[in-house]
Each structure stands twice: as C-alpha cells, then as structure tokens.
Amino acid sequence: MKKLTIGLIGNPNSGKTTLFNQLTGSRQRVGNWAGVTVERKEGQFSTTDHQVTLVDLPGTYSLTTISSQTSLDEQIACHYILSGDADLLINVVDASNLERNLYLTLQLLELGIPCIVALNMLDIAEKQNIRIEIDALSARLGCPVIPLVSTRGRGIEALKLAIDRYKANENVELVHYAQPLLNEADSLAKVMPSDIPLKQRRWLGLQMLEGDIYSRAYAGEASQHLDAALARLRNEMDDPALHIADARYQCIAAICDVVSNTLTAEPSRFTTAVDKIVLNRFLGLPIFLFVMYLMFLLAINIGGALQPLFDVGSVALFVHGIQWIGYTLHFPDWLTIFLAQGLGGGINTVLPLVPQIGMMYLFLSFLEDSGYMARAAFVMDRLMQALGLPGKSFVPLIVGFGCNVPSVMGARTLDAPRERLMTIMMAPFMSCGARLAIFAVFAAAFFGQNGALAVFSLYMLGIVMAVLTGLMLKYTIMRGEATPFVMELPVYHVPHVKSLIIQTWQRLKGFVLRAGKVIIIVSIFLSAFNSFSLSGKIVDNINDSALASVSRVITPVFKPIGVHEDNWQATVGLFTGAMAKEVVVGTLNTLYTAENIQDEEFNPAEFNLGEELFSAVDETWQSLKDTFSLSVLMNPIEASKGDGEMGTGAMGVMDQKFGSAAAAYSYLIFVLLYVPCISVMGAIARESSRGWMGFSILWGLNIAYSLATLFYQVASYSQHPTYSLVCILAVILFNIVVIGLLRRARSRVDVELLATRKSVSSCCAASTTGDCH
C-alpha cells in the first residue's frame, strides 16, 4: 500500500475533530508543533490503496495573519501547508455555514494543492432547510466535494474512496481580482525563490499585498519590493487588502447563489429556544453554576461507585501480591515492605483516581462538543469585561477544570498580550482534575453529609480567587480595557459517542501516564526516606525516619493554617504536590498507612488473589446498584469512600492528625491556591517568561497562605484568641504592603509588558523556511 500524508483543516466548530476521530479511532498520537506549545495530533488509517497519516491542523477561519500578536493557529496551518509535507488536504466545511467556511476553501484552492472538500454537518443544514447541490459545488470549486455527517459516520467510505482517487484540482479561475492586484502579485512572484511552485508564489504575493506578515518569511527578496508595490497600488485603489477580501467574498456569494439556498434558510428553532434561557442575563450565570455542580456531582457519584474495582483490585494485585511474592521468595522484610509500600502503594494511589478523573473528562468533553461551553464564555463576558478581559478569555479558564496546562496554553487564542498574561496568571486557580482527587478523599474523611457542598465551595473559591487576581492585576500592573468580544455560537447537537470516548481516553491516558510516573517515583523515594534514619540505620517506626526528622523542622511554618507539628506528613504532601497535585494523595496515602503496613502481620498462606478480586468486583457492583439511590444522590461523596473505615487505614490516621474539619478545610484551601504543578509552571514560562512564572508562584503562595490562615484562625478563634488576632492582622498588613508595591511598580511593568515573550513572527522573519515552527 502507498503511504499518504493528509492535512485536515477547517474552521472551528466545523466537526473537524469528530471526523478525525471517526477516521483514526484510537490510532492517534498527541504531541506539540515544533517550537510552540500548541497541540499537534496525528492519526493513522487505511483506505483500499493507501496507508494514511492524518495530521489535524489547528482550527482557523483563514490563512491570513495580520498581527504578530495574534493568529498563531493561522501561522501553524499556513506553514504546514506551504512546507509540502502534505500530499493532500481535506477541508472540512460546515454545510450550515457554507458562506463563511468557503473563505478558507478559496485560499486553499488558490494554492494549487490537491484538495477534497468534506461537506460536514449536513444533518444540521437539513434541519435548517438548507439545500446544497453537491455536484454543482464540486464543479464550481474544481475539486471533489463529499457530503458527510461525521457524528453518525455517514459518508466516511465515500471520503476514503475519494482519497484513493485523488488528483490535482481542476484549473478553474475562482476569484476575479482587479488587474492591478494581479500585476503586482505577479511582479512579487517573479523575485521569490524559484523552487516554490508558480501558483504558490502568486498566492504568497496576494497574501503579502493583503497584509499577511507570515508570508514574508517565504518571500525571500520579494519582501524588499513590497512597499513599492503597495505604493503603486494605492495610486489606483484605497485599500488593497479590502479589495482582495472583497473579491473573494464576491466569488463566495456567486457560488452560494448557484449551489444553495442559504439566504432563505431558517435558524435552528431548538438552539434559539434554549439560548433564550441559557443566555438570559439573569438566568445565565445560575444555570452555568448548576451545570458545573451537576458535572462535579455525577463525576464523584459514578466515579466513586466504580472506585472499589480499581482500589481493592490494585491492593490485591500490587500490594498484597507483592507482599506474597516477597514472603514466598524470602525477601528481607524491609525490601518487601519497601516494594509493597513504594511500588505497590504508588500504583494503588494512581488507579483509584481513574474513575472520577475519567468521568470529569467525559462530562467536560460532552459540554464542549454539545456547544454549551461557548455559551458559558458568552455568559461570563460581562464579568470578564469588569476585569478588563474579553469573555473569550473564560474559555481557557473553563478548560482548567480538566487540567491547568491546556488552560495556560489556550491563552494564545487571545488577541492582546495584556489579556493573554492576565488569563495565564488566573488559570492556576481553577481547580483541576488532580485537585478533585484530593478534595474527594478529604471530603469523605471529614465532611460526611456536607461533603458535596465542601468540594463545590472549593471549586467556587478557585473561580473567585481567579477573578480577584484579575481585578488586582487590572488596578495595579496591567491596566487597560478589553478588546471587543466576537464569538461564534455553534448549534446545539448531541455529541458522537465514539468521539467522546476517544477524547476522554486521550485525556485520561495522558493524566495516568503523567501522574503515574511521578507518583510511583515519589512513593518509592518517600518509602526509602521513611525506612532509614538520618544516620542511615533502618527504623522500625516512621516517626524516627529521616523524612520525619526533616519535615518536623519545616512544619511549624504551617502552624497558622492548622498543620500541627505531629502532622509532618501533611507538610511533605505540600512539597511533593508542587511536582503534581495528584501526588498529594499518594504522599499522604504512603505516609499515613506506613505504620499500618509495618505493624501488619501478612500471612502468605491466607492470601487468595481470586477472592480479593471477586470482592472488588462485588463491592463495585453493590456500589453501582446504590449509585442512583436518593441518599447517594443527595450526598455523592459517600459513594466515593469505597470500603475505607474511618477508624483504620489512611483516612483514620488523617482524621486523627488534622484533628478538626476546620484544619482539613484550611489545608484544602492551601492545596487549591498554592504553587501550580511543575507542568503548569513550565507552560507559564513558555507562554510568557520565567519572570512571570516566578510572579505566579509567589502570588499563589501568598494567596494560599493568607486565605488558609484567615479561615483557620477565624474558625478556631475561641481556642487561642490572642494568637489568632496576631495572625489575622499580620496577614492583612502584609497584603496591604504587597498591593501597594504592585501599584508603585505599575509604570515599569507596563513598559515591559510587550516584551514578555518573543513573538512568533519575529522568530519566523529570521528564517526563510519558517524553521521556528
């Protein structure tokens, strides 16, 4: 079979991701585009004659990049197309928005690269009474047009057949440009590198005349002739860029008049009716909060019901199983405990997180694919405008509920560097999936019937602190107003099950692999330090270990937030949590259960793997049957407790160490708000600078320590009023000083704001091949 590389390109919300998942299934690889942190997805699939590598290009409305501060997606797509890596392009077009989508199609066809138009979302178009003549559209464009409903898999085989039959596009003159434009484009094309095909050189010439900055990286000497060409054009027309765009839109209008009835189409009645409620100025925000709470409730509820299978099953396989092997093969006791506690305990920490995190990713994917997340950004626009940000900046923040890394990376979609930086600074306060795992464990241990409310309050606190951080930045070091907010609201539709499963699997796999490696390594590391004293001797009691000795020195720093000196394990959890938040659970699980593992007598003769696995399945089945009972629906945290008795195991020890629900909640406030994990810190440094990364870390630590201290000292004021009053006043005074210093630093920071990161275009301008990407 012949190998073929295909680029998949289309407008946002055109169904491109769904089509990608339909074609490639689970045969996908996710990475980054070279030199940038924008995600790159590749997949494999086969047709009758070809083995295809499909490259999913970023969603974009056009290939024209007007500003160096914006449109990174356009630059990536343009670079890939001009690189010649793709043998063929598949342009996904939304049939219900044909006129808007065809602008990108015309740009692709003008390049002369073989192209297939995948006319998607025909089911939505039909509901709006839109009729499109497929053959007529194909004839006008000069390339194959394949009708598709990717959510149902309709047209996939026809698309594969078209891929096998692909050939060069017919030489059809689509756009009629004014003759002066063509003359100047041809004159620029003549001085471009001769190894670029003639059609592409002419296209680059038009792009340069339109004001595209990225095409200059390919133009060679032609970029030196651009100013003269524009000067000659301005003697004959007011705005060359406007004339180029107008010629394309006239062509699109002529095509649509012939092949469709889009002018008489009816908007989706269902979408219109739902939007009257969801986008209502009074109901929109409460509905958004309810949807977020429902997503969290279902994730905890269903995930908690599935948890025994992963928890009890992993204990049987990786903890008791390792102990059985150790005793059977006569390993030294310390080695058996080390392996069971370190390796087995690490795996046992990761696997029970899978159900709840997986459910969270599933529901997030559902909300994104259904079209609701775009509405959430619209609803939040008024609040974001008060911060000096567009509503569009709330979209990356919502993504932060899954993981803060793509949330930080998503800030690239914002136009101004000020807006981008403010969003990056706010993103770490959004409660990610890893924090959910910590909250669920503490809620089950301390808050009982109020567990769901406690966790929801932490999610809301994260949003509130992100908003307050935005306000602080607006009135201190990042003054300014938001750019106008224009956003497309896609039609509501039921997401495709296969696409949802694939998206959830990709996110969950990334989480497990990333978290698993860190947790297991940290668990082994902690087990080693937990087994030896500072003098190198093996200890029988973890309170005499090297880890305990070092941690006790640091723990008094956290006394104001309710962490007492004998609870040194909680201090270790905070330090390891800086690597990855999910490691906090692993650390506490390893340390709080260490004494139990050391004291526990394991009898290999009584170990029965089959019985323990059957017990895990049976417990999961009972949990699933009880999941949707009224009592569990009212208190989903109870469903996540699994089989852990409060008197024994990690939860029981943790309950004794913290001593009160107030101390536990204060600890959770600190975990929510303090330094982001290493991955997020790296993303912040990459998207802004190391200086801004440092600012984010210091600001997060200040907010976390201040709020946790205020909460705990107010909650426990009656126990030690003098100490509490001193702590409260110290926190307030310190933050007044910090805000004052930030206001004084405003003028200097504003001047340096534009220099926070090297612009992509400047990087490209230094290379005629666009090597920066």
UniProtKB/Swiss-Prot annotation:
GTP 3 binds at D56, L57, P58, G59. It is found in: Cell inner membrane. It is a multi-pass membrane protein. Induction: Iron uptake is repressed by the global regulator Fur. GTP 1 binds at G10, N11, P12, N13, S14, G15, K16, T17. GTP binds at N120, M121, L122, D123, V149, S150, T151. CDD domains: FeoB. The chain crosses the membrane at residues 282-302, 309-329, 344-366, 383-403, 427-447, 453-473, 518-538, 664-684, 691-711, 722-742. Keywords: Cell inner membrane, Cell membrane, GTP-binding, Ion transport, Iron, Iron transport, Membrane, Nucleotide-binding, Transmembrane, Transmembrane helix, Transport. This is Fe(2+) transporter FeoB. It comes from Escherichia coli O6:H1 (strain CFT073 / ATCC 700928 / UPEC). The lineage of its organism: Bacteria, Pseudomonadati, Pseudomonadota, Gammaproteobacteria, Enterobacterales.
